[in-house]
Amino acid sequence: MAARLIGFFLFQAVSWAYGAQPCIPKSFGYSSVVCVCNASYCDSLDPVTLPALGTFSRYESTRRGRRMELSVGAIQANRTGTGLLLTLQPEKKFQKVKGFGGAMTDATALNILALSPPTQKLLLRSYFSTNGIEYNIIRVPMASCDFSIRVYTYADTPNDFQLSNFSLPEEDTKLKIPLIHQALKMSSRPISLFASPWTSPTWLKTNGRVNGKGSLKGQPGDIFHQTWANYFVKFLDAYAKYGLRFWAVTAENEPTAGLFTGYPFQCLGFTPEHQRDFISRDLGPALANSSHDVKLLMLDDQRLLLPRWAEVVLSDPEAAKYVHGIAVHWYMDFLAPAKATLGETHRLFPNTMLFASEACVGSKFWEQSVRLGSWDRGMQYSHSIITNLLYHVTGWTDWNLALNPEGGPNWVRNFVDSPIIVDIPKDAFYKQPMFYHLGHFSKFIPEGSQRVALVASESTDLETVALLRPDGSAVVVVLNRSSEDVPLTISDPDLGFLETVSPGYSIHTYLWRRQ
């Protein structure tokens, strides 16, 4: 109760303002609400404007239903609050941020395009415009994955080692590519694309199937590996003809998946030694000798595999010279402490970027695929993002941008959740708590922002991270996964004190000018 009273008095002097359009909430019986959007209405946010010097902006989302609501307060010359003090240390700098985003899978594209054009536009605007959460990363699967409705690659003609029959199907030309172009037009920020393959054509594989235990035939340096490396270049060539260029490719989506008998959907197995030699002899040279200025990210699998996978690949100078970064997935994070994996990998290879390339909830066998309005799932996202940022990761990529209420479509029924769920019969979509949790980072932390130290005066259950934006302003994100309200003060040594309170089950983003 005392904490609630403190929070009440702290914000008596704060003026409230709301985004351009408030949320229309709807409960589906879970812990919080979704925001309902249709052809005629969708909640939106104002473009980010820096508050006047000496004041701060606070964006708040709560389990009780606030969604990135803006308030403005004054930075005080003297501290008046008690309890937790978070001190910004801007001189202690860490990694620079690449960005935040999600994946344009076949399933995502099918769901978006099943909506009416006005509703499609509002969905894309929610993700990519200044009135939305301003994603700047899009992941693109190279050909089919489990979130497709059919199985295909770009070169299914057997023994076509010249890739003469390589071609993009309508999933790319009619679905994904047009939507990516729409996103690019809506965005005020440069959007970086990265691509990942799930499987090679079956005629290049030891098991002759898209799924199950199987890897490339032969040995690195041979015609099978060279053809597969050239397939990457063909993909980049094909997308370039549609005016799309890629920031990066990953060497393989979850390369360990293809090492398991009975793996249910598209995969291609690599050990770390196999990936090392494929990169050094085939993929690295193929990309370097192409016309594309594209980065190569290794691993693209669970961080549980670190640091060993990085040690195997990057200890070989011939492979290391082609590797820009290490991509990680989140699914086994509960078995892999960040310090022992991400932290140790950064210690060993401080000049190789770490990048979170896939995450979703609802994939584990004990989880319900979709839980409309789950606040806990939003907190799982923001907890992961903060943890990753604190351990040198430069960006965080969600999985499907939009799914249906079942969590698909997915050809092997591997249904999962998504920040946006599309209700096709109603020509509507639902923005979940996950969407807003992601927005607390993506909208306010543009590419080039740099993490700095933020030191707590005492042990706390709050999870926090601080960054300096390219414009010199400061951003602090505070996540409270507990039920208790927590009074706190943020100290900027050059300016003064931000007196505030973190309500139970909330996430806040603070933004202020430093000069």
Curated annotation (Swiss-Prot):
Signal sequence, start to end: 1-19
Keyword field contains Iron-sulfur: no
Disruption-associated phenotype: Homozygous knockout mice die within 24 hours of birth. They are under weight, respire abnormally and show rapidly progressing cyanosis. Feeding and movement are also decreased in these mice. Macrophages accumulating glucosylceramides in tubular lysosomal deposits are found in liver (in Kupffer cells), bone marrow, spleen and brain. Hematopoietic stem cells conditional knockout of GBA1, leads to widespread and organ-specific dysfunction of immune cells.
Pathway membership: Steroid metabolism; cholesterol metabolism; Sphingolipid metabolism
Active site residues per record: 254, 358
Reactions it catalyzes: a beta-D-glucosyl-(1<->1')-N-acylsphing-4-enine + H2O = an N-acylsphing-4-enine + D-glucose; a beta-D-galactosyl-(1<->1')-N-acylsphing-4-enine + H2O = an N-acylsphing-4-enine + D-galactose; cholesteryl 3-beta-D-glucoside + H2O = cholesterol + D-glucose; a beta-D-glucosyl-(1<->1')-N-acylsphing-4-enine + cholesterol = cholesteryl 3-beta-D-glucoside + an N-acylsphing-4-enine
Name of this protein: Lysosomal acid glucosylceramidase
Native species: Mus musculus
Gene: Gba1
